[in-house]
Amino acid sequence: MDLVIVESNAKSKTIQKYLGKEYIVEACGGHVQDLPKSNNATWSNDDGHLPKPPWGWTKGAEKTVNKMLKKASDKNVNTIYVATDPDREGEFIAWRLFAIFTKAGYHDIQRVTFNAITKKQVEESLEKASDVDMNLVDAAIVRRLMDRLVGFRASKFANSW
């Protein structure tokens, strides 16, 4: 049995119908981890590398992911397919899920994407599974860091007028 993780409940129900009982299809609900909320958060980095902040759980995500981990354990899941959206944010979510499931002892984790929720597209994507695109992940991290470093401060400054 294999686990497929998508972002939304609606997608999970449709894809579950396509794949049948050989798969468990679960929704993560979008972002599972993000930058800490602290306004004073700072992160150091090695020269030439992006900072490596401690990623914190988003609201409700830890409970959702723990349910997926328990189900994966109970059903003796072999392969985990992370089928988040095929964009920068989807890639970031996939990267965080890879890290979480790897830490939990799962090693056969694959990235899949599809542009349409059709039976054919879903089945073809499982056959073409790959790894996370770290260029897209880096782009998502930079956007988050810039939002935090510039956006939060600019907002505070603008509100002080």
Regions found by a protein language model. Give the residues of each.
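Intrinsically disordered, low-complexity regulatory segments
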Residues: 1-161
